[in-house]
């Protein structure tokens, strides 16, 4: 069972609304630098699905649940969240993973 002090690794799946691919991409890229500066952030990398342009995956890792919660309360993440409904074809999906091998 996962403890609140355990490292959190996840993939966020974000699918752009029709015609919003570039705007979504720009908004996601704005999150990278400030998130990487957060003391609890371990990894934050954006990918786009080759076979499905406009479907983005954000690989992210935080030292614990509190660090992820803190990230979600930042001004820049809240600014993105306020725009998300207009940009996304469906709600953001956050998939949590358990690390099996050493990095």
Predicted ranges, named:
Residues 5, 26, 42, 47, ...:
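Intrinsic disorder/low-complexity signal
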Residues 19-21, 51, 67, 101-102:
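Generic "edge-of-domain/loop-turn" microfeature
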Residues 4-38, 42:
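N-terminal first-folded block
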Residues 30, 36-42, 61-95:
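An amphipathic, aromatic/His-enriched active-site/gating alpha helix that lines ligand/cofactor pockets
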Residues 8-15, 45-72:
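Short, well-ordered beta-strand segments in beta-rich or mixed alpha/beta enzyme
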Residues 1-6, 46-52, 82-103:
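Glycine-rich beta-strand-turn "strand-cap" elements at beta-sheet edges
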Residues 21, 25, 55, 74-77:
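Short, structured helix-loop boundary elements
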